[in-house]
């Protein structure tokens, strides 16, 4: 095939002189250049041709990841008889004391007694998780725990924990905690979220991304696609993962990846963001961009 790019237009011809239909659901503005010959580069991989506009500055999408309310989990780690358990929220302390009666120092009973002591706390959502209590609020709050067993029988995790083993064994679906790791640097920090299994009332912590970040590429500024379809026609568009059906055939366009874990320190934006991509290549099953003095390559796929 021969591809001809003009200002705001793209044509595909066969070597026999046949012109093929090119559908353009989006992306033609990417071709709005007065010097197509000096502006565009392309590389073909199987049924896809990636086209770059060397005058286009790449950017991240303005959309941001979801954010969470302020949240914390109090955990009763062990029940000890004749011991006081305390939770202090925004400066007010709520307490319960166990006795020598075994039922009073079961962890679930201690939690129930603390929830009763706290009562209806304005602005808070409070959830009984058995041996744990989940707190959330749209406004920030302070919360600490103490106990009469050297503060070894309870703990509170709010926003951060130093080690993975410090995390509570239960939480509410979607709760995010930062694992701070070594205090001497920020490079080993990572984030985990609670993934709940509703069928077992259990769950697990899974690595995730800090909320509120711009994690996706602005596909309007990234190299675009010319895709050959089974019906002989072509489709020029953004590489945005769009799915569509044509003549009974399902298509899924390639999609540039997103930041799925970490933050802007541990998983920074690629160096080509804010730059103009000057060339594109394919090497050992990896797509590569040249921007400024950097070469950035995809994972092997």
Q: Model-found features: residue ranges?
A:
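Extended, beta-strand-rich, solvent-exposed assembly scaffolds of outer structural proteins
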Residues: 1, 5-53, 73-150, 172-203, ...
